[in-house]
Amino acid sequence: MYTTRFFSTRTKARASALLLAVLLCLSLARCANSQTAPGATIPVQIDKASATVSYLGPEGTYTQEACGVFFEKQGSYLPYTTVQEAVQALVEGQTSYAVIPQENTIGGAVIDYVDTLIAQTEVSVVGEVELPITQNLLALPGTTLAEIKTVYSHKQGIAQGKDWLVEHLPDAEVIEVSSTAEGARMVAEGKDPACAAIAAAACADVYQLDILAAGIQNNENNKTRFYVLSMQPAATAEAERLAFIAIGDAKALPELMTAMEKQDVTLITLHDRPLKTELGEYYYLIECAGCSYESYQELSKTEGFSFRFLGCFDVE
């Protein structure tokens, strides 16, 4: 009787072990099926309706306008005082995306913001907006151009309106502020008829200002390129553009350009920022067209550089 009970218990134990083994195999099979297969591409995935987007504020900046273009006026947009704060909000999970200016037709690379992108090693680029920029001189209602003694704007706004200022307000004091919209806000709140701001026409509505002069930018084809950033893994699926950072010595740059030519890759933009270790060593922020992820992988074999992939994305 005792022997029979012992045999029965041992049999049950074996059966239980077999059942656990089967369940484990099934679980592993499910996990394997859910993994991305080797060589599979990662697409850009954006839920515009539920997006929370951090941007350089206050309300009325061109960056806010770029947010509306990319996200089709869906989601919610949260203004921050600086681009660094806007990107940090993304990194800390307070927002799901951040939109930052990257380059302007007249002002060139927006250096501070390029540095911010380089410093945040976990972010990816999931989209781009090329926005036509029309600069305007805004002032309190009833103000005349002859009254203006001080002009506020972001340094890009100042650069873009420099020729007009030299011709029409040569004696005005020009003061740099954190954004074009911040300049408009200061004029509205300061209530000084001697002050004006270079900003978007939208700021006239937001801050109840008059447009004293429209379209004062130096170039009628003035545009700014904005990047849409995310904490998602960098997308590898084929798209209009691809961006990456190459880190290395300037002497090796011709070799990288030759490698791009061999891969039939079109260079869209290249910005260099010092590595701050040795003279001649740089971060190169590179955006290109006609470049698949496979082509990028070949480029990343170029000697003399280390690489950081930012993503494949389309342009709005």
Report each predicted region and the residues it spans.
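Domain-level signature for soluble enzymes in the chorismate/prephenate branch of the shikimate pathway
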Residues: 14, 18-316
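N-terminal secretory signal peptides that target proteins for export/translocation
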Residues: 1-10
